[in-house]
A protein has these predicted regions:
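Short glycine-rich or small-residue beta-strand-to-loop segments that form or flank ligand, phosphate
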Residues: 9-18, 76-81, 194-200, 310-317
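N-terminal beta-loop-helix "entrance" segment that forms/cooperates
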Residues: 38-62, 238
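Glycine-rich phosphate/nucleotide-binding loop
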Residues: 54, 238-340
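Glycine-rich phosphate/diphosphate-binding loop of Rossmann-like nucleotide-binding domains
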Residues: 11-28, 33-34, 159-232
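N-terminal glycine-rich phosphate/adenylate-binding segment common to multiple enzyme folds
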Residues: 53-165, 253
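Buried hydrophobic packing segments
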Residues: 26, 30, 214, 308-316, ...
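Buried hydrophobic positions in well-ordered alpha/beta secondary-structure cores of metabolic enzymes
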Residues: 16-19, 73, 140, 182, ...
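Glycine-rich phosphate/pyrophosphate-binding loop and the adjoining helix
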Residues: 71, 144-145, 150-196, 200-204, ...
């Protein structure tokens, strides 16, 4: 949908809660990067996918939302959800999950990297602290089918005969395309190491099929080392030896779990980024921080904007500007380095505001 030349149109959706505070800082840094590297970015702001919009209109997004954002090169997203006002399944299925499915964003990509100035809660076996960069992995999650299907139902509700069923859906095209993305990513990295998450010893139909497709895909990538772990022991390995992993690929549910656990092992989810990708570039991809809307701290200008900035860097990379991505990431690392004396938000031991940190990263560029 886009190449590295020409104007890039970005649909900006701040959403709910702290998204309204982190998004301006993300845009600030993206504008600084665009200026530095000569990238022509145009930001179009939208107020839907939020409680405020739902309160006014009775739905999370307008009926013509696809027309409004479908022609953009990317979607830059803040956060969605306000559980005290609207049920999560309403806000998510009415916005974020619609983007993922209607725009066929079949890859959810999350880096988990130990950054300077962040103390990892998982130490080495000898009890010593891990160094920046010692944990450096990507979690690749299948994002449009799998366990998160809407196929199923409820029978005889409220009676002793009540039955609830929900089906896992795996298609060959759905599994193969996310595996291909993961193998290509692993091949591009120095370690060339891919780990598959499974549970074929307990889930007797879909997970053996997943394993079969991994084995078949591996034949086309003889240069990539492949291993697999059942999800229960894999979560233990994430905690005990996170430095072992390079690229981890998983189904929708397992990937959802691992892609939160991975960043948590690096010290804080507050700075973690995420991308919902349509690698075929037929539709815009969506870039969002891992953190939620955090209504408990919304409106106080204390949220950490680094996750928002980092996912913006991923957006620049996907749009063909790897140099800008690298520069933004280096600016984040510089601000996080305790030796820099740069401002830090309260979640990582500082007292600075959201705005202070955003300005510091932009200045570091």
């Amino acid at each position: 949908m886009s190449n590295s030349t020409g104007k890039k149109r970005i649909a900006v959706i701040a959403g709910d809660g702290i998204g309204k505070e982190t998004m301006p800082e993300g845009v600030r840094v993206m504008e600084a990067a665009a200026s530095k590297f000569g990238i022509d970015l145009a930001f179009d702001h939208f107020d839907f996918s939020s409680w405020d919009y739902y309160e006014k209109h009775g739905q999370m997004m307008p009926d013509n939302w696809k027309d409004l954002v479908g022609g953009h090169d990317a979607i830059y997203f803040g956060a969605v959800g306000w559980p005290e006002k609207i049920a999560d399944h309403v806000s998510l299925w009415g916005s974020l999950l619609l983007f993922r499915r209607e725009f066929d964003q079949y890859v959810n990509l999350r880096p988990a990297r130990l950054m300077p100035g962040i103390i990892a809660p998982v130490v080495r076996r000898d009890g010593s602290a891990r160094e920046p960069g010692e944990i450096d992995m990507y979690i690749v999650r299948e994002n449009t089918e799998g366990e998160y299907s809407s196929i199923g139902g409820r029978m005889f509700p409220g009676t002793e005969r009540e039955i609830v069923m929900q089906e896992t859906v795996m298609s060959r095209i759905g599994v193969d395309r996310v595996l291909k993305f993961a193998f290509e990513l692993a091949r591009s990295r120095p370690e060339k190491h891919l780990t598959s998450a499974t549970k074929s010893n307990g889930i007797a139909i879909t997970m053996p099929y997943w394993d079969e497709r991994v084995a078949e895909m591996a034949k086309s990538y003889p240069d990539v080392k492949v291993d697999k772990f059942h999800i229960d022991i894999l979560t233990a390995h994430f905690v005990q030896r996170p430095d072992f992993f390079d690229v981890v690929v998983a189904s929708n549910l397992f990937g959802d779990i691992l892609s939160d656990l991975g960043p948590a092992c690096t010290g804080t989810i507050g700075i973690a980024p995420s991308a919902n990708l349509n690698p075929d570039r037929l539709f815009p991809s969506l870039f969002e921080p891992v953190h939620g809307s955090a209504p408990d701290i919304a409106g106080r200008n204390i949220a950490n904007p680094i996750g928002q900035v980092w996912c913006g860097a991923m957006m620049l990379d996907f749009l063909g500007h790897r140099d800008a991505h690298d520069a933004v990431l280096q600016a984040i690392e510089k601000v996080l380095d305790p030796r820099s004396g740069a401002p830090r938000t309260g979640d990582i031991g500082g007292t600075a505001s959201t705005t202070d940190v955003g300005r510091a990263i932009a200045a570091a560029l």
